Protein backbone atom coordinates (compact mmCIF):
# COMPACT_ATOMS: atom_id res chain seq x y z
CA UNK A 1 0.00 0.00 0.00
CA UNK A 2 1.18 3.50 -0.74
CA UNK A 3 1.61 5.22 2.57
CA UNK A 4 1.99 8.91 2.47
CA UNK A 5 2.04 12.25 0.77
CA UNK A 6 5.48 12.68 2.28
CA UNK A 7 7.09 9.81 0.40
CA UNK A 8 5.40 10.86 -2.79
CA UNK A 9 6.45 14.47 -2.66
CA UNK A 10 10.05 13.69 -1.76
CA UNK A 11 10.90 10.46 -3.54
CA UNK A 12 8.86 11.00 -6.68
CA UNK A 13 10.09 14.57 -7.07
CA UNK A 14 13.66 13.35 -6.65
CA UNK A 15 13.18 10.69 -9.30
CA UNK A 16 11.47 13.04 -11.74
CA UNK A 17 13.24 16.37 -11.44
CA UNK A 18 16.76 16.01 -10.07
CA UNK A 19 19.52 16.45 -12.61
CA UNK A 20 21.24 13.04 -12.81
CA UNK A 21 20.60 12.47 -9.08
CA UNK A 22 23.39 14.94 -8.30
CA UNK A 23 23.74 16.37 -4.79
CA UNK A 24 23.67 20.17 -4.77
CA UNK A 25 23.54 20.89 -1.02
CA UNK A 26 24.50 18.93 2.09
CA UNK A 27 23.18 20.29 5.39
CA UNK A 28 23.75 18.78 8.84
CA UNK A 29 21.76 18.99 12.05
CA UNK A 30 22.20 17.63 15.58
CA UNK A 31 25.95 18.28 15.76
CA UNK A 32 27.05 19.35 19.24
CA UNK A 33 30.57 18.12 20.03
CA UNK A 34 31.40 16.83 16.55
CA UNK A 35 32.50 19.39 13.97
CA UNK A 36 30.94 19.69 10.54
CA UNK A 37 34.36 19.00 9.00
CA UNK A 38 34.70 15.71 10.85
CA UNK A 39 31.13 14.72 10.02
CA UNK A 40 31.71 15.47 6.33
CA UNK A 41 34.76 13.20 6.26
CA UNK A 42 32.79 10.37 7.86
CA UNK A 43 29.88 10.95 5.48
CA UNK A 44 32.11 10.37 2.46
CA UNK A 45 29.91 12.48 0.18
CA UNK A 46 30.21 16.02 -1.07
CA UNK A 47 28.30 18.46 -3.23
CA UNK A 48 28.48 17.37 -6.85
CA UNK A 49 28.51 13.64 -6.06
CA UNK A 50 25.83 11.33 -7.42
CA UNK A 51 23.25 10.21 -4.87
CA UNK A 52 24.02 6.65 -3.69
CA UNK A 53 21.41 3.95 -4.18
CA UNK A 54 21.25 3.12 -0.46
CA UNK A 55 21.78 5.13 2.72
CA UNK A 56 21.97 2.31 5.27
CA UNK A 57 25.71 1.64 4.94
CA UNK A 58 26.49 5.36 5.11
CA UNK A 59 24.35 5.81 8.21
CA UNK A 60 26.11 2.87 9.85
CA UNK A 61 29.52 4.27 8.91
CA UNK A 62 28.63 7.61 10.47
CA UNK A 63 27.56 5.91 13.68
CA UNK A 64 30.64 3.68 13.84
CA UNK A 65 33.30 6.21 12.89
CA UNK A 66 31.93 9.04 15.01
CA UNK A 67 30.57 6.96 17.89
CA UNK A 68 27.08 8.40 17.52
CA UNK A 69 23.79 6.97 18.77
CA UNK A 70 21.84 7.66 15.57
CA UNK A 71 22.36 8.91 12.03
CA UNK A 72 19.62 9.56 9.48
CA UNK A 73 19.96 10.68 5.86
CA UNK A 74 17.07 12.32 4.03
CA UNK A 75 17.05 13.62 0.48
CA UNK A 76 14.65 16.22 -0.87
CA UNK A 77 14.23 17.96 -4.20
CA UNK A 78 15.60 20.46 -5.10
CA UNK A 79 17.97 23.44 -4.88
CA UNK A 80 17.84 26.44 -7.21
CA UNK A 81 19.78 24.55 -9.88
CA UNK A 82 17.55 21.47 -9.73
CA UNK A 83 20.01 19.35 -7.76
CA UNK A 84 19.23 17.27 -4.67
CA UNK A 85 19.44 18.46 -1.08
CA UNK A 86 20.86 15.92 1.37
CA UNK A 87 20.09 16.39 5.06
CA UNK A 88 22.24 14.51 7.56
CA UNK A 89 20.65 14.15 10.99
CA UNK A 90 22.81 13.26 13.97
CA UNK A 91 22.10 12.23 17.54
CA UNK A 92 25.40 12.12 19.35
CA UNK A 93 24.18 10.51 22.60
CA UNK A 94 21.38 8.03 23.19
CA UNK A 95 18.18 9.69 24.39
CA UNK A 96 17.34 9.02 28.04
CA UNK A 97 13.66 8.74 27.23
CA UNK A 98 11.87 8.19 23.95
CA UNK A 99 9.81 11.16 22.78
CA UNK A 100 7.55 8.78 20.89
CA UNK A 101 4.45 6.88 21.92
CA UNK A 102 4.79 3.11 21.76
CA UNK A 103 2.87 1.58 18.84
CA UNK A 104 -0.62 0.34 19.78
CA UNK A 105 -1.62 -3.29 19.22
CA UNK A 106 -5.27 -3.52 18.19
CA UNK A 107 -6.11 -5.59 15.12
CA UNK A 108 -8.38 -2.92 13.63
CA UNK A 109 -8.56 -1.50 10.10
CA UNK A 110 -10.18 1.30 8.15
CA UNK A 111 -12.97 0.58 5.66
CA UNK A 112 -11.57 -0.14 2.21
CA UNK A 113 -13.36 2.85 0.67
CA UNK A 114 -11.17 5.13 2.80
CA UNK A 115 -7.90 3.33 2.06
CA UNK A 116 -8.74 3.07 -1.65
CA UNK A 117 -9.50 6.79 -1.79
CA UNK A 118 -6.24 7.59 0.00
CA UNK A 119 -4.26 5.49 -2.48
CA UNK A 120 -6.03 7.18 -5.40
CA UNK A 121 -5.26 10.56 -3.87
CA UNK A 122 -1.63 9.53 -3.58
CA UNK A 123 -1.46 8.56 -7.25
CA UNK A 124 -3.14 11.80 -8.35
CA UNK A 125 -0.71 13.78 -6.25
CA UNK A 126 2.23 12.00 -7.86
CA UNK A 127 1.03 13.12 -11.27
CA UNK A 128 0.48 16.68 -10.02
CA UNK A 129 4.02 16.81 -8.62
CA UNK A 130 5.42 15.58 -11.93
CA UNK A 131 3.69 18.54 -13.60
CA UNK A 132 4.91 20.98 -10.95
CA UNK A 133 1.38 21.60 -9.60
CA UNK A 134 1.98 21.63 -5.85
CA UNK A 135 0.04 24.65 -4.57
CA UNK A 136 -2.69 24.18 -2.01
CA UNK A 137 -5.24 26.21 -0.04
CA UNK A 138 -5.35 25.61 3.74
CA UNK A 139 -7.70 28.48 4.59
CA UNK A 140 -10.37 26.04 5.83
CA UNK A 141 -7.95 24.20 8.12
CA UNK A 142 -7.13 21.41 5.66
CA UNK A 143 -5.34 21.12 2.34
CA UNK A 144 -7.18 21.53 -0.94
CA UNK A 145 -4.74 21.19 -3.81
CA UNK A 146 -4.74 23.41 -6.88
CA UNK A 147 -4.67 20.26 -9.01
CA UNK A 148 -8.30 19.28 -9.66
CA UNK A 149 -7.71 15.51 -9.76
CA UNK A 150 -5.94 15.58 -6.41
CA UNK A 151 -8.52 17.91 -4.90
CA UNK A 152 -11.30 15.53 -5.97
CA UNK A 153 -10.01 12.92 -3.53
CA UNK A 154 -9.38 15.47 -0.80
CA UNK A 155 -13.02 16.49 -1.07
CA UNK A 156 -13.92 12.83 -0.57
CA UNK A 157 -11.94 12.97 2.67
CA UNK A 158 -14.34 15.67 3.88
CA UNK A 159 -17.19 13.17 3.52
CA UNK A 160 -15.28 10.36 5.24
CA UNK A 161 -14.24 12.59 8.12
CA UNK A 162 -17.83 13.73 8.61
CA UNK A 163 -19.53 10.32 8.46
CA UNK A 164 -16.81 7.92 9.65
CA UNK A 165 -15.00 9.94 12.27
CA UNK A 166 -15.42 7.28 14.97
CA UNK A 167 -13.52 4.58 13.08
CA UNK A 168 -10.89 7.08 11.92
CA UNK A 169 -10.22 8.18 15.49
CA UNK A 170 -10.20 4.61 16.78
CA UNK A 171 -7.75 3.40 14.13
CA UNK A 172 -5.51 6.42 14.63
CA UNK A 173 -5.23 5.77 18.36
CA UNK A 174 -5.26 1.97 18.45
CA UNK A 175 -4.40 0.16 15.19
CA UNK A 176 -1.23 -1.93 15.21
CA UNK A 177 -0.76 -1.23 11.48
CA UNK A 178 1.26 1.98 10.90
CA UNK A 179 -0.09 2.34 7.36
CA UNK A 180 -3.62 2.38 8.73
CA UNK A 181 -2.66 4.98 11.34
CA UNK A 182 -0.91 7.12 8.71
CA UNK A 183 -3.98 7.07 6.48
CA UNK A 184 -6.26 7.90 9.40
CA UNK A 185 -3.97 10.77 10.45
CA UNK A 186 -4.22 12.34 7.02
CA UNK A 187 -7.97 11.87 6.49
CA UNK A 188 -9.07 12.88 9.99
CA UNK A 189 -7.57 16.32 9.42
CA UNK A 190 -10.57 16.96 7.13
CA UNK A 191 -13.05 16.78 10.03
CA UNK A 192 -15.46 19.71 10.07
CA UNK A 193 -14.96 20.10 13.84
CA UNK A 194 -11.20 20.67 14.00
CA UNK A 195 -11.32 21.14 17.76
CA UNK A 196 -12.73 17.63 18.18
CA UNK A 197 -9.81 15.90 16.44
CA UNK A 198 -6.94 18.08 17.68
CA UNK A 199 -6.12 15.81 20.62
CA UNK A 200 -6.19 12.74 18.35
CA UNK A 201 -3.71 14.40 16.02
CA UNK A 202 -1.48 15.56 18.88
CA UNK A 203 -1.28 11.96 20.06
CA UNK A 204 -0.43 10.86 16.52
CA UNK A 205 2.26 13.56 16.33
CA UNK A 206 4.30 11.52 18.83
CA UNK A 207 3.58 8.15 17.19
CA UNK A 208 6.48 5.71 16.95
CA UNK A 209 6.11 5.70 13.15
CA UNK A 210 7.69 8.58 11.20
CA UNK A 211 4.97 8.69 8.54
CA UNK A 212 2.16 8.86 11.10
CA UNK A 213 3.94 11.74 12.83
CA UNK A 214 4.46 13.53 9.54
CA UNK A 215 0.82 13.25 8.44
CA UNK A 216 -0.46 14.31 11.86
CA UNK A 217 1.84 17.33 12.04
CA UNK A 218 0.92 18.37 8.51
CA UNK A 219 -2.77 18.27 9.47
CA UNK A 220 -2.11 20.20 12.68
CA UNK A 221 -0.22 22.91 10.78
CA UNK A 222 -3.31 23.61 8.68
CA UNK A 223 -5.53 23.56 11.78
CA UNK A 224 -3.13 25.88 13.62
CA UNK A 225 -3.31 28.34 10.74
CA UNK A 226 -7.11 28.31 10.95
CA UNK A 227 -6.99 28.73 14.74
CA UNK A 228 -4.76 31.81 14.40
CA UNK A 229 -7.21 33.45 12.02
CA UNK A 230 -10.34 32.41 13.94
CA UNK A 231 -9.64 32.49 17.69
CA UNK A 232 -13.37 32.13 18.33
CA UNK A 233 -13.07 28.45 17.43
CA UNK A 234 -11.12 27.96 20.70
CA UNK A 235 -8.73 25.44 19.15
CA UNK A 236 -5.70 24.88 21.37
CA UNK A 237 -2.61 23.14 19.99
CA UNK A 238 0.14 22.30 22.46
CA UNK A 239 3.59 23.29 21.19
CA UNK A 240 5.34 20.73 23.42
CA UNK A 241 5.67 17.80 20.97
CA UNK A 242 6.94 20.14 18.27
CA UNK A 243 9.49 21.78 20.57
CA UNK A 244 10.75 18.28 21.40
CA UNK A 245 10.96 17.42 17.69
CA UNK A 246 13.52 20.18 17.19
CA UNK A 247 16.04 17.79 18.79
CA UNK A 248 15.08 14.83 16.60
CA UNK A 249 17.68 13.27 14.27
CA UNK A 250 14.85 12.64 11.78
CA UNK A 251 14.50 15.38 9.16
CA UNK A 252 10.73 15.03 8.71
CA UNK A 253 10.24 15.61 12.44
CA UNK A 254 12.20 18.84 12.32
CA UNK A 255 10.63 19.97 9.06
CA UNK A 256 7.07 19.58 10.34
CA UNK A 257 7.93 20.94 13.79
CA UNK A 258 9.23 24.11 12.15
CA UNK A 259 6.09 24.32 10.03
CA UNK A 260 3.79 24.12 13.07
CA UNK A 261 5.90 26.35 15.33
CA UNK A 262 6.22 29.03 12.65
CA UNK A 263 2.43 29.33 12.91
CA UNK A 264 2.16 28.99 16.70
CA UNK A 265 4.74 31.77 17.23
CA UNK A 266 2.98 34.22 14.90
CA UNK A 267 1.53 36.20 17.81
CA UNK A 268 4.83 35.97 19.71
CA UNK A 269 3.49 34.42 22.89
CA UNK A 270 6.13 35.25 25.48
CA UNK A 271 6.06 31.89 27.29
CA UNK A 272 6.39 29.94 24.07
CA UNK A 273 9.31 32.05 22.88
CA UNK A 274 11.04 31.62 26.25
CA UNK A 275 10.56 27.85 26.02
CA UNK A 276 12.13 27.83 22.58
CA UNK A 277 15.01 30.02 23.71
CA UNK A 278 15.74 27.97 26.82
CA UNK A 279 15.39 24.52 25.26
CA UNK A 280 16.08 24.68 21.53
CA UNK A 281 17.97 27.90 20.80
CA UNK A 282 21.01 26.00 19.53
CA UNK A 283 18.91 23.78 17.26
CA UNK A 284 17.16 26.81 15.79
CA UNK A 285 20.48 28.53 15.10
CA UNK A 286 21.85 25.42 13.41
CA UNK A 287 18.81 25.00 11.16
CA UNK A 288 18.53 28.73 10.42
CA UNK A 289 22.04 28.49 8.90
CA UNK A 290 21.12 25.72 6.47
CA UNK A 291 22.22 26.52 2.93
CA UNK A 292 18.85 25.33 1.62
CA UNK A 293 17.02 28.65 1.91
CA UNK A 294 13.49 27.35 1.71
CA UNK A 295 14.07 24.78 4.44
CA UNK A 296 16.02 27.20 6.65
CA UNK A 297 13.45 29.98 6.51
CA UNK A 298 11.00 28.74 9.17
CA UNK A 299 13.86 28.13 11.61
CA UNK A 300 15.18 31.61 10.86
CA UNK A 301 11.71 33.10 11.31
CA UNK A 302 11.21 31.40 14.70
CA UNK A 303 14.74 32.27 15.83
CA UNK A 304 14.16 35.89 14.86
CA UNK A 305 10.97 35.99 16.88
CA UNK A 306 12.83 34.52 19.86
CA UNK A 307 15.38 37.30 19.38
CA UNK A 308 12.73 40.02 19.12
CA UNK A 309 13.35 40.87 15.46
CA UNK A 310 10.25 42.13 13.56
CA UNK A 311 8.82 39.74 10.97
CA UNK A 312 9.13 42.33 8.20
CA UNK A 313 12.90 42.46 8.73
CA UNK A 314 13.19 38.67 8.89
CA UNK A 315 11.28 38.24 5.64
CA UNK A 316 13.40 40.92 4.00
CA UNK A 317 16.77 39.31 4.75
CA UNK A 318 15.82 35.63 5.06
CA UNK A 319 16.52 34.71 1.43
CA UNK A 320 19.97 36.31 1.32
CA UNK A 321 22.49 33.93 2.93
CA UNK A 322 25.18 36.47 3.98
CA UNK A 323 22.59 38.86 5.44
CA UNK A 324 20.77 35.98 7.09
CA UNK A 325 23.95 34.72 8.76
CA UNK A 326 24.86 38.24 9.88
CA UNK A 327 21.48 38.64 11.59
CA UNK A 328 21.80 35.17 13.16
CA UNK A 329 25.20 36.18 14.58
CA UNK A 330 23.59 39.30 16.03
CA UNK A 331 20.79 37.28 17.67
CA UNK A 332 23.28 34.75 19.09
CA UNK A 333 25.44 37.53 20.52
CA UNK A 334 22.45 39.22 22.13
CA UNK A 335 21.30 35.91 23.63
CA UNK A 336 24.69 35.37 25.31
CA UNK A 337 24.23 38.62 27.22
CA UNK A 338 20.89 37.48 28.71
Region spans (language model):
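Short, solvent-exposed interaction modules
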Residues: 259-261, 265
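Extracytoplasmic/secreted envelope proteins and their assembly/folding machinery
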Residues: 36, 40-43, 55-63, 165, ...
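Sec/Tat signal peptide C-region and signal peptidase I cleavage site
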Residues: 14-18
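Sec-dependent N-terminal signal peptides
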Residues: 4-13
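Extended repeat-based scaffolds of very large eukaryotic assembly and lipid-transport proteins
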Residues: 91, 95-195, 203-206, 210-240, ...
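Periplasmic polypeptide-binding modules associated with outer-membrane biogenesis and secretion
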Residues: 19-32, 45-104
